[in-house]
C-alpha cells in the first residue's frame, strides 16, 4: 500500500471520536499530492484502507509509544528505516537533544520535506536528518556519512517494510546489528517469529505482541483481515544486551 494511502488512513484516525493519535500533517501530504497532480486512491484501494484502519492505527500508536519510551530511557539517537509519509519528527514530543535520522528513497523524502516546508512546519525533534538512500544498496554508509554515531545506543524502527525487502530481512538486520552497540533498541513489524528468533541469537532481548492482541490493547478489533496485514503479523521490541 502506498505512502499516500497510509497517510489517508492516519488522516481518518485523527478525525475519529477517540483517536489513538493526532497527525495533522497527514492532511498536508494529501493536499500537497493533489496539488501536484496525484490522484486519490481508487474505490478499491479506499476499501482496503478502510479494511485495515484499526490495524494501521494500532501500528502507528505502538511505534509512537516505542519512540517515546526510548527517549525516556535516555536514548538520543533514533533511526526510522523507510519513514514514508509519517511525520513523527514533527508530531511527537521528543526529548531535548534528540537526533532523528529518516532513511527513504530520495523522492519520498523530497516530497515530504517540501510539503511540510511549504506549510511552514518545523520539526519538533532537536535535530532532524533526512537520509536519501536505496535500502537495497549502501544505506548504512549513507547513514554514517550523514552523521550517525556508531558508538551511541540507537532506537531503530522498521515499520511496513519487510514485505518489500527483496534481498531478505536478515541482510537488513545484519546491517542494523553491525552498527548498534549494547543498549540499542529495535522495533519491527514482522511476519511470523523469524525476525525475533534471529535477533535472540544475536544478543538481543526480545518481546513480541501479536496484531490482534495489540488492537485489543488499544480498544480496536475486528478488521485485521487484509492480505497486507495477516494474522501472523507480530510487533517485535528488542534491546541489544551484548
Swiss-Prot record:
GO biological process: methylation
Keyword Transferase: yes
Binding site for S-adenosyl-L-methionine: 104, 134-135
Family under the similarity heading: Belongs to the UPF0677 family.
Keywords: Methyltransferase, S-adenosyl-L-methionine, Transferase
Domain of life the protein comes from: Bacteria
Known function: Exhibits S-adenosyl-L-methionine-dependent methyltransferase activity.
Annotated TM spans: none
EC code(s) of this entry: 2.1.1.-
Any one GO molecular-function label of the UniProt entry: methyltransferase activity
Protein's name in the database: Putative S-adenosyl-L-methionine-dependent methyltransferase Mmcs_0580
Organism: Mycobacterium sp. (strain MCS)
A family per Pfam: LCM
